[in-house]
Design a protein with these regions (language model features):
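A short, conserved alpha-helix within the catalytic core of class I
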Residues: 119-127
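Class I SAM-dependent methyltransferase SAM/SAH-binding core
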Residues: 44-46, 52-99
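Conserved Class I S-adenosyl-L-methionine
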Residues: 52, 178-260
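Nucleotide donor/acceptor-binding cores
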Residues: 42-43, 105
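Conserved class I S-adenosyl-L-methionine
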Residues: 1-41
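Short catalytic micro-motifs in class I SAM-dependent methyltransferases
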Residues: 114
Length: 260
């Protein structure tokens, strides 16, 4: 197991916190994906690296037929509980994105929400090409903080850079740009798919002070720090927010491509 995959699997240890604090995705994102990829009504979707189902639940709520694939048992347990609570039909499979075990040409769409960077990209795209029908597509999307448009987010990143060391500084300074380029490169190299499209959909999310700090502590690069450093980060973050101030700071960024 590679270090990247191991870091991704570290989320299993805090599945409940992940589900409580991680941001959701707007309905407009899925409308945009459906339009760009010319999906049929109620498409059959495989959601890879589904986690606790932030995207799976959103798509199922829209009436999409969702199969959630997730290697982590604790994450799947939360997803299944949410599906039962919300009376949603979501099929679940405990497997990796690189080897789902699903039938060939079974889906109109494959998605990966805030997850593709954890995958073995060539292997995952080969598996996606296998399970997606001709004329179907893949959509890879992230909620991304807008540092350029938010002084609050810029301050938050400076805290992480100060306490997180070289690895976190590298992630914050270059990770998003590198992730975008490697995603597009991986899609371009996957001969089963047509040209990739990079789309941006701006949306705003709010959080209380506790919610913001809770979200920050679901990041793998924060969880990897020692407890004393985590406590210092939490104190500074609470100081930034000053009470229950609402924070608006994210947008969704999908990459999509169609299978001829």
């Amino acid at each position: 197991m590679t270090s990247t995959v191991e870091r991704g699997r570290s989320f299993d240890g805090w599945a409940a916190e992940y589900d409580r604090y991680r941001p959701t995705y707007p309905d407009a994102l899925f409308a945009l994906i459906a339009q760009e990829l010319q999906l049929p009504p109620r498409p059959q979707v495989v959601d890879l690296g589904a986690g606790t189902g932030r995207a799976s639940v959103a798509m199922a709520t829209l009436g999409w037929q969702v199969t959630a694939v997730e290697p982590g048992g604790p994450m799947l347990d939360v997803l299944r509980s949410r599906a039962i609570r919300d009376q949603l039909e979501i099929a679940t499979v405990q497997a990796t994105a690189e080897a789902t075990g699903l039938g060939a040409a079974s889906f109109n769409l494959a998605t990966a929400a805030q997850a593709f960077h954890w995958f073995d990209k060539p292997a995952a795209l080969a598996e996606i090409a296998r399970v997606v029908r001709p004329g179907g597509g893949v959509a890879l999307f992230w909620n991304v903080r807008e540092e350029e448009r938010s002084a609050f987010v810029a301050d938050y990143h400076r805290i992480l850079e100060r306490y997180g060391g070289a690895a976190e500084g590298k992630y914050l300074q270059a990770g998003r740009a590198t992730g975008r380029s490697t995603t597009r490169e991986a899609l371009a190299a996957a001969i089963e798919f047509g040209p990739a499209q990079l789309l941006e959909l701006h949306h705003e999310l709010t959080a209380t002070a506790a919610g913001f700090v809770g979200m920050a502590f679901t990041a793998s690069y924060v969880r990897a720090l020692d407890s004393a450093t985590q406590e210092r980060i939490a104190r500074e973050e609470f100081g930034m927010v000053r009470g229950n101030k609402e924070i608006l700071y994210r947008f969704a960024e999908p990459d999509s491509a169609r299978k001829p």
